[in-house]
Amino acid sequence: MLSPKRTRFRKQHRGRMKGISHRGNQICFGRYALQALEPAWITSRQIEAGRRAMSRNVRRGGQIWVRIFPDKPVTVRPTETRMGSGKGSPEYWVAVVKPGKIVYEMGGVAENIARKAISIAASKMPIRTQFIISG
């Protein structure tokens, strides 16, 4: 699972996901990519599940790049706990993804293989996505 080695602060505010992604919205490394179409928090488990599904599909020869990193801690309070007494402890990490953000990139394979692998990875994501080709 992906997570930061160390952070400056243990806990973060939830924040708001306004607007579109202005950075990380171009294909940089591969030829094919999976682009987010709606805003969401994507957990490190979801990122890893998508990566595994893609790598299992392309086997050798293909290269995969994960363009998002879960750097935001999400805190969860223990069950059956009364209100108050501080914020919960960090449970898992999420990547904040806005519309337009490239999630995965792929290269070194034929388009039909890439399309199949990326569609399997897209089914693991909690958002609508699209397959794009660098032109």
Swiss-Prot record:
A GO molecular function held by the record: structural constituent of ribosome
Q: How does it assemble?
A: Part of the 50S ribosomal subunit.
Q: What is this protein called?
A: Large ribosomal subunit protein uL16c
Q: Which PROSITE patterns would you find in this protein's record?
A: RIBOSOMAL_L16_1 (PS00586), RIBOSOMAL_L16_2 (PS00701)
Q: Which CDD domains match?
A: Ribosomal_L16_L10e
Q: Which PANTHER family match?
A: 50S/60S RIBOSOMAL PROTEIN L16, LARGE RIBOSOMAL SUBUNIT PROTEIN UL16M
**Keyword set includes Ribosomal protein:** yes
Query: What is a biological process (GO) this protein takes part in?
Result: mitochondrial translation
Q: Where in the cell is it found?
A: Plastid, Chloroplast
The entry sums up its family as follows: Belongs to the universal ribosomal protein uL16 family.
InterPro entries, per the entry? Ribosomal_uL16, Ribosomal_uL16_bact-type, Ribosomal_uL16_CS, Ribosomal_uL16_dom, Ribosomal_uL16_sf
Q: Name one GO cellular component term.
A: chloroplast
| Pfam family, any one | Ribosomal_L16
Sorted keywords for this record are:
Chloroplast, Plastid, Ribonucleoprotein, Ribosomal protein
